[in-house]
Amino acid sequence: MTKVAINGFGRIGRLVFRGLLDRTDLDIVAINNPSGPETAAYLLKYDTVHGRLNKKVEIDKDDLIVDGKRIHVFQDRNPENLDWSAYGTEIVIESTGKLKDKESAEKHIRGTVKKVIITAPGKDEDATIVVGVNENIYDPAKDDIISNASCTTNCLAPVCKVLNDTFGIKRGLMTTVHSYTNDQAILEKAHKKDPRRGRAAAENMVPTSTGAAKAIGIVIPELKGKLNGLAIRVPTPDVSLVDLTVELDKPATKESVNAALKAAAEGKMKGILAYTDEPLVSSDFKTTDVSSTVDSLLTMVMDDNLVKVIAWYDNEWGYSMRIIDLVAFVAGKF
């Protein structure tokens, strides 16, 4: 088993932890949570969105014990002070949301640590990988700092790949209707980057930026510069959707677009992309493992080559499952 540690025990860090508990190929040995083991245990055990963890959670000094498994809890904001090697850690999952550039993330690499997976879009990272789309680019010899991209890119990329491979994409625009996150405010306050994100998240639809569309050009190079988009944050705690409109190179119909997406969901992208023909709503996709679920009832085609596709995603749980998949993929190359 490959030994794994998590730096940062927020929304994504805790869900990745939950997922790792059931793996037989990956062994979670340590976390870093400056708030301490008591807070870590409490927030791990109780989750408003995804429910109570159905495992026994205990604390023993600086360790969590989950169903008898002991996991050490560091409490230090400086990555250079984290002795991951004391627990044989080989891969660090960097989920603080703060150490997103290569220079910061690679501070984890020393001793037994070989690779770092950033749970966000990176900066100057060695590779950005969306599992199911471009993991073939991974070079174990030189790619040590790897970004898992964003949850929205993980939803968008599989759909774009299928459409581009089948019909060709000339250009497109996307909107993510996205559940609010901890980057927003419950009540109004100043926001360091975007004044709209400082408005009350549970009371407003909040237009803001997303880098997901432009990031597609990193994951699928032939689409570089062909997509752009924005986000509308909405008053729900989890589950989002991508509304993608593209102009295609080849003529298409609603039936042919849906057929291509369904074939991918049942074939080469199974477990990454899913397909539904039921009239579902956001809560139906809570705690779904896939990156993206195409809502075939909402597919539209105009004038043979203007296409709209709607895809749902659990921006927390689905994304966390892809992080685990990426860790397992990287570990498999050791």
Positions of the model-derived regions?
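N-terminal Rossmann-like NAD(P) cofactor-binding subdomain of oxidoreductases
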Residues: 1-198, 301, 323-325, 333-334
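General structural feature for long, well-ordered alpha-helical segments within catalytic domains
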Residues: 8, 16, 27, 104, ...
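Generic secondary-structure signature for well-ordered alpha-helical cores
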Residues: 21-25, 161-169, 179-182, 210, ...
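Short clusters of hydrophobic/aromatic residues that line enzyme substrate/ligand-binding pockets
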Residues: 64, 129-131, 145, 187, ...
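Short, solvent-exposed beta-strand edge segments and adjacent coil->beta transition regions
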Residues: 142-143, 200-202, 239-243, 306-308
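Hydrophobic alpha-helical scaffolding
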Residues: 149-150, 205-207, 313
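Catalytic core of tubulin tyrosine ligase-like
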Residues: 168-231, 237
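C-terminal active-site/capping subdomain that shapes the small-molecule cofactor and substrate pocket
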Residues: 229, 241, 245-334
